[in-house]
Structures are given as structure tokens and as C-alpha cells.
């Protein structure tokens, strides 16, 4: 195999990911095989399956791959800009489909429901994201919105921004949440102050703050369960 890059055609028929997908379904493929299909070709010294494994190792499996940028992908030998753009677009499409499926029917009744809804999306974030879930009278998620990115501070997270969307969506209630990039969801004094302030405004305008959930790495804390919601 002199100067030609190695493609999926160089893999024995029965082992080709595309053929396996056709005959066994996408669910039967390994992460490496799915990445290989997306890459299509390897390099003159590395098969496409080897390149796929190289990509997964570079990003610690799927853990960091979901946040991969074009710049990060093109830093890997064998991945050009066009291939990196297609890769990022496929990741974003999968993320959007997942979000739509979740929100179509997702009902929140407990802090565990909140955690299941956002954990995989939020536990890897490198900055604090303050997010609101707006619910209808059946506790179904109407809308999810990131209100603020950065260190949480009672003077920065303004109730106006939180409740403006609640009024626009005719929400019956809302749940606030944010992540701690450290992975430790223990609430800070600022977290508690923000919760009290939003609960007071919600009581005044008739849109109840049901909870404020802090997301860590595979763990979470409900400020309602900790007794920090003054009107619950």
C-alpha cells in the first residue's frame, strides 16, 4: 500500500463497519467503527480503523469527543478541515436530536429527574452555566435556556432575565440549575443567596421556583431538599 491512503475497502469484507451496519444495524457497531465510518479514510501509514482509535484515545473515548472543535480535530494527523467540519456537524446533530427527544415528553417530579435530564450535558462543562427549565402545569419541560455563563453571583443572575422567558412561555413554574466545574455540587453562600432571591420574585409574580439543583460529576444537590427554598 504505497502512496494510497488506507480506506474501509482495505478492511476484509466481513469486518467493514459499513457492511456490519447494513446487516446488523448501527447499534451493533463499536465506537471505533462508528468513528471510522465518519472518517471514511485513514492515512498512508494508518488504516481508517487505526485512525478512529487514535481519535478516541486523543479525546478519552466519547467523554471529550462530544465537545471537540475543528481546531482540535485537525491537530490529529490524517484529519483535514473538511473532515473535521463534517465530524463536528454530526456531533451537533446528534446532540440536537437527543435534546428534542428528551424535551418532547420529559416530566420533572423529583431532583433525580432534573439530574437525568441534564447530567451528561452539564457535568463536563469547564465554566459554570446557569440554566432554567420552564415547566407547564403538568411539570413537563416547555423550554430549557442558558441564562448566564460564568461564576455565580447574586448581583449577576438577575431575576428579570430568569422570569422574562417564563412569562413569554406562559410557564407555570421553573427549576434553576447550574454546574460546578470542580465536580463537587456542595452549594456556596452565593448559590443560596441566588436561590432565595429568585424564590421571592417567583412568589410575587405567581411563577413558583420549584428547586435549584447543582450539578457535579455524576452527583447533584437539591437546594430544596437541603431546606434552602423559603416558600416550599
Swiss-Prot record:
Q: List this protein's GO terms for biological process.
A: proteolysis
List the ranges annotated as motif JAMM motif. 178-191
State a single Gene Ontology molecular function. metallopeptidase activity
Instruction: Identify the keywords attached in UniProt to this record, alphabetized.
Output: Hydrolase, Metal-binding, Metalloprotease, Protease, Zinc
Membrane listed as a keyword: no
Q: Where does Zn(2+) bind?
A: 178, 180, 191
The residue ranges of the MPN domain are: 107-229
Q: Which family does it belong to?
A: Belongs to the UPF0758 family.
Tell me what this protein is called: UPF0758 protein BH3032
* Organism, scientific name: Halalkalibacterium halodurans (strain ATCC BAA-125 / DSM 18197 / FERM 7344 / JCM 9153 / C-125) (Bacillus halodurans)
Amino acid at each position: 500500500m504505497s502512496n494510497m491512503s488506507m480506506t474501509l475497502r482495505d478492511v476484509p469484507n466481513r469486518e467493514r463497519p459499513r457492511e456490519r451496519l447494513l446487516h446488523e444495524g448501527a447499534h451493533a457497531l463499536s465506537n471505533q467503527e462508528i468513528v471510522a465510518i465518519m472518517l471514511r479514510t485513514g492515512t498512508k501509514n494508518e488504516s481508517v480503523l487505526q485512525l478512529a482509535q487514535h481519535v478516541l484515545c486523543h479525546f478519552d473515548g466519547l467523554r471529550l469527543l462530544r465537545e471537540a472543535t475543528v481546531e482540535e480535530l485537525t491537530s490529529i494527523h490524517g484529519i483535514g478541515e473538511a473532515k473535521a467540519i463534517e465530524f463536528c456537524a454530526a456531533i451537533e446533530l446528534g446532540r440536537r436530536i437527543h435534546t428534542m427527544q428528551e424535551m418532547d415528553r420529559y416530566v420533572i417530579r423529583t431532583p433525580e429527574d432534573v439530574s437525568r435530564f441534564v447530567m451528561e450535558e452539564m457535568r463536563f462543562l469547564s465554566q459554570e452555566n446557569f440554566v432554567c427549565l420552564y415547566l407547564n402545569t403538568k411539570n413537563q419541560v416547555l423550554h430549557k435556556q442558558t441564562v448566564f455563563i460564568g461564576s455565580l453571583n447574586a448581583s449577576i443572575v438577575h431575576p428579570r432575565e430568569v422570569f422574562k422567558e417564563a412569562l413569554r412561555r406562559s410557564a407555570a413554574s421553573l427549576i434553576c440549575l447550574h454546574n460546578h466545574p470542580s465536580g463537587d455540587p456542595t452549594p456556596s453562600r452565593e448559590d443560596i443567596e441566588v436561590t432565595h432571591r429568585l424564590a421571592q420574585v417567583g412568589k410575587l409574580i405567581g411563577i413558583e421556583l420549584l428547586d435549584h439543583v447543582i450539578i457535579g460529576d455524576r452527583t447533584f444537590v437539591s437546594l430544596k431538599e437541603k431546606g434552602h427554598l423559603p416558600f416550599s
